[in-house]
Amino acid sequence: MIVDTSAVVALVQGERPHATLVAAALAGAHSPVMSAPTVAECLIVLTARHGPVARTIFERLRSEIGLSVSSFTAEHAAATQRAFLRYGKGRHRAALNFGDCMTYATAQLGHQPLLAVGNDFPQTDLEFRGVVGYWPGVA
């Protein structure tokens, strides 16, 4: 399962009902993964809300949920551009931003479900059940 920044923020901030749904999805996940650029985005968002302790908060959560970090390759970059062309802000109602496009690309290339909170990813071709989006034809 690929984890988006929005899911981590919902969990850390205790956003109801999303935090509960994210925690349940993570409890059922084998090995949740976040791409390296998404980790950077997540740290920036958490730092804006929590200051310098954001790194500690993130690393503690990462350890608790067994979150691994994946590399981001040229193939990911090309898939990110394709995601932007199809679903990017100003091009589609999903209005995916740069970080969203990277997360979408990571999930797409890995054929992995996507854990996210918000109204953007459900506007893509992912089929959402709660906070987890699945690729069409894959449950």
Swiss-Prot record:
Binding of Mg(2+), residues: 4, 100
Keywords: Hydrolase, Magnesium, Metal-binding, Nuclease, Toxin-antitoxin system
This protein's record includes keyword Magnesium: yes
EC number(s) given by UniProt: 3.1.-.-
InterPro entries: PIN-like_dom_sf (IPR029060), PIN_dom (IPR002716), Type_II_TA_system_RNase (IPR050556), VapC_family (IPR022907)
Residue ranges of every copy of the PINc domain listed in the record: 1-127
Required co-factors: Mg(2+)
Signal sequence, renumbered to the chain: none
Coiled coil: none
Source domain of life: Bacteria
Sample GO molecular function, one term: magnesium ion binding
Family affiliation: Belongs to the PINc/VapC protein family.
Role of this protein: Toxic component of a type II toxin-antitoxin (TA) system. An RNase.
PANTHER family: RIBONUCLEASE VAPC2 (PTHR33653:SF1)
Record's protein name: VapC ribonuclease Mb2004c
Species assigned in the record: Mycobacterium bovis (strain ATCC BAA-935 / AF2122/97)
